[in-house]
Regions:
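Single conserved hydrophobic/aromatic residue that forms the stacking wall/gate
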Residues: 1-8, 12, 183-189
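Metal-dependent phosphoesterase signature
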Residues: 49-88
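Helix-loop "lid/cap" segments that line or gate small-molecule binding pockets
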Residues: 22-23, 43-58, 115, 147-148
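Short glycine/proline-centered loop/turn elements that form peptide/ligand docking sites
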Residues: 88-89, 164-167, 184
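Active-site neighborhood of HAD-like aspartate-dependent phosphohydrolases
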Residues: 6-38
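Substrate-recognition "cap/lid" segment bordering the active-site pocket of phosphatases
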Residues: 79-82, 108-160, 165-174
């Protein structure tokens, strides 16, 4: 994940501004940035469904929002996002130590790859998976199983690091050990 606790609100802003842009273009009401904290995490289609007003949450409308969102987000997905503090150094250390590193995101594939290429050009990831056509999004464990196959490792050899409940559920569904970093405060949890 690409945002530290101080920056979480800014990172959500990239998705929030892009979603608000799409909603506005389609004549729907927009949301305050803070509300997006509770809309993100299950892929962009679920984000759009949550952002659309009641009575407008059809598959057709989700696709309409997606059509407006993607070109805008492709340009603006790194406006405010930054890696978590210390993550570039940690990834470099893991790479130097010969540990395989992969990415499993619910962002769509092109955006995931663009962000990884932008922020971590010196890091070799064995796989960078975003939301892919025909593959269920997290918390479905398919993405983890795909990475296990590429890495040729067992579940017992994996440490899944995530920053959301969806990540922890994904790890549990895949049967791998997980560590959580969260931007949420205790009263929110």
């Amino acid at each position: 994940h690409l945002c530290d606790r101080r920056q979480r609100q800014m990172c959500i802003r990239d998705s929030a501004h892009s979603t608000n842009h799409a909603l506005n273009k389609l004549g729907y009401p927009t949301h305050e940035i803070e509300k997006y904290n509770f809309m993100v995490g299950n892929g962009i289609d679920k984000l759009f469904e949550r952002a659309l007003p009641e009575g407008e949450k059809s598959k057709e409308n989700v696709l309409r929002v997606r059509k407006e969102f993607v070109p805008y987000y492709d340009v603006h997905n790194a406006d405010d996002s930054r890696p978590y503090s210390g993550i570039p150094e940690l990834l470099a250390y893991l790479q130097t130590s010969g540990i395989q590193i992969a990415v499993a995101s619910n962002k769509y594939q092109a955006a995931t790859q663009k962000l990884i290429d932008h922020y971590f050009p010196e890091i070799h990831f064995i796989a960078v998976f975003g939301q892919r056509e025909g593959v269920k999004v997290k918390p479905d464990p398919t993405v983890v199983f795909d990475i296990l196959e590429i890495a040729k490792v067992t579940k017992e050899e994996v440490l899944y690091v995530g920053d959301s409940g969806v990540d922890m559920q994904t790890a549990a569904n895949a049967g791998v050990t997980a560590v959580s970093y969260t931007h949420l405060t205790l009263p929110t949890i």
